[in-house]
């Protein structure tokens, strides 16, 4: 667990006693101050930078196992129990006790919102290295592969929807491993045979206090806030999901659930994971369009329009009249391929890259229940509208770009994300036919 100080607390020595005192908003929130002994002061000072609770414990073990004489000269005010630990030369059981004491200290300060859990970059030396993994509390359970992107899932297998089954990838030998066997980054690397680009950890517990930061969007279904650690995401309409945290690059997300209703939790997680995947996919040059799709003459055609506009009606008519296969009943993922296998994170096809647009299969398909794991070239896009008679209307280039962009469900939390979606829509308008079909 990575931890860091909360903003709004300062350490003050008053008449020889060390106090951790709140200020600013923490006072307005009626947060309390606490007294720290010398060990607590040492731990607080070490937390100037974020670290794991294990690393913090090791620092304290090293601190107490330093030169014995020097330690006795400078630690006159340490509690008798701590002196005994030093005098016993830090026996293994004493070191274990110190580690337990540190974890208890951390948990107490987390409960008081003096410390906070944080998401830490997995490989600070190379954040783009796809072989890097984030340490997780929960065991590895499944690996998904969608459009060449591999997503490792951690937590309880009983919470993973069967709707992911067709997209499961055997990329690990970690099946059946206990939590203790998969705690460190190096251990996780050993268990995962193939590089994963994204990790999602499902935790059945409450989260510690986190500052919300700047609210980017808020509606009845989704709340997204941005802080220095990344994003905090809430799902107001979901009862089983408490909240979620995601790094700024989208490579690691933690979803906190109550898990009281397993089936409901499984259903909500399936839909919630889509948001994290689409955020990460957008950064890799993949974009989702709200549309139903058919396979016609080895190319996929998208029918896109507002709800109730007739997407399913059109695709079903094509199936009835021409025997075309329906690829996805609600959502289609588009990327670009130059004929070579995409190497995510290194040779990823961005919206401004060369190549032909490809429709990639993914598990999310609305209520249609129709999804595919296959990928095909994109033939074109048919935008649907209402009219008193059936006819096509020509669209100007700007209309094509804007209307396709408006049919995307790739995130637009920021201006940069909007710009990215517009670039994708402009590339589509240039490379494939886009029609506007009005029907009664």
PLM ranges: what are they?
Residues 1-12:
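Hydrophobic packing positions characteristic
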Residues 314:
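Hydrophobic positions on the alpha1 helix immediately C-terminal to the Walker A/P-loop
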Residues 14-18, 103, 118-301, 307, ...:
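A noncatalytic interaction/capping subdomain that flanks phosphate/NTP-handling catalytic cores
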Residues 310:
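Conserved glycine(s) of the Walker
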Residues 69-97, 177-201, 345-346, 350:
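Intrinsically disordered, low-complexity segments used as extracellular stalks/linkers
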Residues 12-40:
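Short alpha-helical segments that sit at the start of domains
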Residues 328:
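Phosphate-/nucleic-acid-contacting segments
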Residues 32-139:
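Long, charge-rich, low-complexity alpha-helical segments
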């Amino acid at each position: 667990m990575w931890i860091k100080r909360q903003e709004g607390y300062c350490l003050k020595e008053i008449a020889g006693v060390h106090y951790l005192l709140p200020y600013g908003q923490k006072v307005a929130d009626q947060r309390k101050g606490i007294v720290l002994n010398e060990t607590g002061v040492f731990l607080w000072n070490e937390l100037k930078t974020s670290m794991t609770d294990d690393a913090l414990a090791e620092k304290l073990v090293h601190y107490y196992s330093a030169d014995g004489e020097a330690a006795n000269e400078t630690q006159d005010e340490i509690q008798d129990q701590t002196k005994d630990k030093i005098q016993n030369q830090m026996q293994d059981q004493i070191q274990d006790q110190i580690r337990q004491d540190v974890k208890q200290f951390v948990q107490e300060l987390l409960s008081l919102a003096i410390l906070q859990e944080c998401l830490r970059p997995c490989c600070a030396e190379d954040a783009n290295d796809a072989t890097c993994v984030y340490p997780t509390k929960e065991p590895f359970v499944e690996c998904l592969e969608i459009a060449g992107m591999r997503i490792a899932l951690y937590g309880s297998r009983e919470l993973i929807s069967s709707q992911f089954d067709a997209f499961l990838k055997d990329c690990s030998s970690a099946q059946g491993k206990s939590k203790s066997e998969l705690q460190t980054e190096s251990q996780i690397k050993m268990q995962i045979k193939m590089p994963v680009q994204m990790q999602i950890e499902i935790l059945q517990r409450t989260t510690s206090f986190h500052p919300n930061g700047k609210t980017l969007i808020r509606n009845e279904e989704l709340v997204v806030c941005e802080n220095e650690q990344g994003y905090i995401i809430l799902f107001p309409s979901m009862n089983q999901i408490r909240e979620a945290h995601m790094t700024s690059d989208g490579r690691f997300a933690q979803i906190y659930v109550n898990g009281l209703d397993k089936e409901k939790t499984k259903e909500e997680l399936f839909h919630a994971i889509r948001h994290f995947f689409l955020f990460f996919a957008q950064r890799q040059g993949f974009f989702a369009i709200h549309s139903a799709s058919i396979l016609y003459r080895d190319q996929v055609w998208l029918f896109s329009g507002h709800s109730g506009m007739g997407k399913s009606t059109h695709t079903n008519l094509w199936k009835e009249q021409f025997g075309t296969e329906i690829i996805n009943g609600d959502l289609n993922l588009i990327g670009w391929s130059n004929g070579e296998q995409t190497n995510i994170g290194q040779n990823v096809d961005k919206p401004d890259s060369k190549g032909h647009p490809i429709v990639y299969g993914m598990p999310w398909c609305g209520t249609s229940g129709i999804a595919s794991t296959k990928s095909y070239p994109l033939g074109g896009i048919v935008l649907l509208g209402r009219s008193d008679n059936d006819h096509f209307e020509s669209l100007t280039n700007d209309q094509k770009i804007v209307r396709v962009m408006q049919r995307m469900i790739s995130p637009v939390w920021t201006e940069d994300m909007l710009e990215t979606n517009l670039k994708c829509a402009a590339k589509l308008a240039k490379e494939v036919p886009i029609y506007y079909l009005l029907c009664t």
